[in-house]
Amino acid sequence: MTLPAILLLSGIILLGAYLLYGKYVFEKFNINDKNQTPSHQYKDGVDYVPSKPIVVLGHHFASIAGAGPIVGPIIAVTFGWIPAIIWILVGGIFFGAVHDLGSMIASMRNQGKSIGTIIKNNIGYKGKQLFMIFSFSTLILVIAVFADIIAKTFINNPGVASASILFIGLAVVFGTVNKFVADKKSLFIIISIIGVALMYYFVYLGMQIPFALNYELWLYILLAYAFIASVTPVSLLLQPRDYLNSFLLYGLIIFATIGIFYANPEIKMDTQVNITSENLGYLFPVLFVTIACGAISGFHSLVASGTTSKQIDKEGDAKVVGFGGMLIESFLAIISVAAVIILSREEYASSLSLKGPVTMFSDGLGSMMATLGIPEQMAVSFVALTVSAFALTTLDTCTRLARFTLQEYFEGAENPVGKQLSGNRYLSTGIVVVLSILLIRSGGFTTLWPIFGSANQLLAALALLAIAVWLININVNATFVLIPMFFMFTVTLTSLGIFAWKNFQEEAYVLSIIAAILFVLSIILIILAKKSLEQKPPIPEIGNSFK
């Protein structure tokens, strides 16, 4: 089979899944545009802002994509490109899309609150607090890691820093203008065209005016930006930046697809499936932890139930944003695999070691896009900058999500400190930023990062658990959620067990203990869920539910 044929077949499967399986899932969730969404019910102009579906899709897609659907699939090709593609397609359709849409709809039916609140309403208060501590800790780790990565990227590529600053300025202008023309479709289209054109121009301009600072300055500038992005109205900075940035990814997907079809490169990598890898371990469970974004990722549930659910205008918009957004990401993951299987297995192994996944992705697509008449170096730079731009999107979205998590954790607190943390977005964001700085300064994030893959997939399993219990409690057949849930618990518990034992043997006791704690956490939440179903408690009348 040729590379264009693989891409075409994958695209047809994903589109067919949206039209066929998607229809089944939409009916199971009883999506109804007559239901009032939280963005209208709790509209505050800061977090709850009803927005156009294309704008919300841009925010959601930009937030969930990042480097995940590029790095994970390319590393997982170590086991063979056929199992990687199969997991992306099966996982994206039956696991990830259900997980993302379910998180979004469950949140919308519960005041636009997070998965933690879904757990509280359906499993219990203890379950909520445990989940919130886990998700908050994970978000702080992600903020620290990405702040470090972006600061180093800006040092090595000052042009990327310049382009990123220009993007932020453009986003603020776009968000401000959009407030006055949002209700006028023709004007919105015009400012979108102008905004996207300027954004692509800023890609070029940024490379011409590199902006160089040292690591310390970039680190504090980035975290100051993250603070501002977390507390300002979502429609002023976060949403327009993500919306405009999403067109970089759309452009990347379009140019890459055309380039693959036009170049029609030979697939040099063999079809061998490796059950084990010297560096990674066994195909099960490692493949299913390594390919998260593109198949199923717990981080998506935090975005879907955190920022996105508060911006959905009508419930029907969640179909394309939640379910469709995941399938678009799956297609991007397929492109990532395509970018490296034009290498032989020996060339792949050497490049992975020397260059890393992002450079391999940039070089692979750059060479194919060059056949369209685009200078190869320009194409490679465009791909690399696109990936870097979405790292910044992950940083600002995670900061806002961590703020939401902290506020929800202390929601209903009677002590003065808890009340302040719950009600004051400036104080809660300040704590998020300070904790991130402390983690960076300590260097602890480099120690903790190896466990993120397993922790992220545990988030997915727990989100599916919350969705399943919620559906069962309102008398909906949850089999379509329970099957991926059981599989993901099997994957994550196996992965955590292996990880804990391996690190114990290597005397990396901190990682071993954390893995053991996460293992126990998941067991506790499963037991709490089982008890709640046996007791069948009444579900509080919060938000809109099924008719």
Predicted regions and their residues:
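Membrane-interface "cap" regions at the ends of multi-pass membrane proteins
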Residues: 13-70, 282, 286
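Membrane-interface helix-loop-helix modules in multi-pass membrane proteins
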Residues: 49-110, 121-125, 142-156, 320-347, ...
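Flexible loop linkers connecting adjacent transmembrane helices
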Residues: 23-49, 75, 85, 89, ...
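Membrane-helix boundary/coupling elements in multi-pass transport proteins
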Residues: 67-74, 91-93, 99, 103, ...
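Loop-to-transmembrane helix boundary motifs in multi-pass membrane proteins
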Residues: 125-140, 324-330, 375-379, 392, ...
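Transmembrane helix-loop junctions in multi-pass membrane proteins
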Residues: 2, 68-70, 82, 141-158, ...
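Extracellular loop-to-transmembrane helix junctions
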Residues: 2-19, 76-107, 116, 161-171, ...
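Extracellular/periplasmic helix-exit of transmembrane alpha-helices
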Residues: 260-274, 327-363
